[in-house]
Amino acid sequence: MLQEAIKKIVLKENLDEKEAYEVMGEIMSGNGTPSLIGGLLIGLRLKGESVEEITGFAKAMRDNAVKLQLDADYVIDTCGTGGDGGKTFNISTAVAIIASAAGVKVAKHGNRAVSSKSGSADVLRELGFNIEAEPMYTKKMIEEKGMGFLFAPLYHRAMKNVLPIRRELGTRTVFNLLGPLTNPAPIKGQVLGVYDRNLTHPIAEVLLKLGIERAMVVHGFDGLDEITTTAPTYVSEVKEGEIFDYVIDPLDFDIPYSKPEDLKGKGPRENAEIIIDILKGQKGPRRDIVVLNTAAALYVGKLVENLKEGVELAERLLNSGLAYERFLEILGYQRRIIS
């Protein structure tokens, strides 16, 4: 199936959803050689991935993942595709912690760095979390403390053969898109940053096909896979079975423009320190971008009616110290239940 798929893709022909599902199934079964998988990934990158292809791949990965069943009505994820070249600190990881302090339940799905210096797993480990906690512990963390981390290799075990190929290619591939689309938890809301402006609407279409109730798929005018504060941001919102495309500007929320260099991160240790400083109330451009993205998480989490309310709530959580308290609670709870 892989060879046939590559032949189609080389001719710039799209796979349908069923074909894509079968191709991913073959990869996960371990039958795909590194050269075939690499050829498929590069071919898709050059052609451009279709909605049907991404949906089929995502459904196959979800069906073959270790499922995390939760006793919670509404759970969200906050993540980006990566591959934007922005080299920012781990914004969505900070957002997940703050959103949980507001009462939103967050199943943060992520991995170690592949095409960046610091993935969500890297920075969470530096913050003191056991990123390889068994699913039963992560389930308790989400249900009791509002946030847990789902380390992708623990849940997508069949993908272990793909990671070395991704690292060797050293460029973004369809797997940058699939990571955020294959959360093993039953999430219903999502803030998803993408590396290309032309992906916001197609990825919103995929989310609809995957059963997401409310989402914001975002891409900054500056290229970031976040809601940026250096410029406006493109948004494709999923709400009540429809997709709405619009642009938001940080100035609309009384957040000043920042400079790209103000948002840069470094390695996991430095990024962890940045997150701690923000949670402790430090002000500045880094806090501003976290606040705006937290507002989006609170909105897709159905805790606020709009982003303006979300910004106000995020500011209160940081100013009051509640966000930092929640971070310590989550960390302490994980250590207690695992020990």
From Swiss-Prot:
Q: Which residues bind anthranilate 2?
A: R166
User: Which positions are annotated as binding Mg(2+) 1?
Assistant: S92, E226
Known EC number(s)? 2.4.2.18
Q: Which cofactor does it need?
A: Mg(2+)
Q: Name one GO biological process term.
A: L-tryptophan biosynthetic process
Instruction: Give a yes or no for keyword Magnesium in this entry.
Output: yes
The record's catalysed reaction(s) read:
N-(5-phospho-beta-D-ribosyl)anthranilate + diphosphate = 5-phospho-alpha-D-ribose 1-diphosphate + anthranilate
On cofactor binding, the record's note says:
Binds 2 magnesium ions per monomer.
Q: Which residues are Mg(2+) 2-binding?
A: D225, E226
> Which keywords does UniProt give here?
Amino-acid biosynthesis, Aromatic amino acid biosynthesis, Glycosyltransferase, Magnesium, Metal-binding, Transferase, Tryptophan biosynthesis
- Stored InterPro entries: Anthranilate_Pribosyl_Tfrase, Glycosyl_Trfase_fam3, Glycosyl_Trfase_fam3_N_dom, Glycosyl_Trfase_fam3_N_dom_sf, Nuc_phospho_transferase
Q: In which pathway does it act?
A: Amino-acid biosynthesis; L-tryptophan biosynthesis; L-tryptophan from chorismate: step 2/5
Question: GO molecular function: any one?
Answer: magnesium ion binding
Gene3D superfamilies this protein is in? Nucleoside phosphorylase/phosphoribosyltransferase catalytic domain, Transferase, Pyrimidine Nucleoside Phosphorylase, Chain C
Subunit info? Homodimer.
Matches recorded under HAMAP family: TrpD
What's its job? Answer: Catalyzes the transfer of the phosphoribosyl group of 5-phosphorylribose-1-pyrophosphate (PRPP) to anthranilate to yield N-(5'-phosphoribosyl)-anthranilate (PRA).
Q: What is this protein called?
A: Anthranilate phosphoribosyltransferase
Native species: Caldanaerobacter subterraneus subsp. tengcongensis (strain DSM 15242 / JCM 11007 / NBRC 100824 / MB4) (Thermoanaerobacter tengcongensis)
Q: Which gene encodes it?
A: trpD
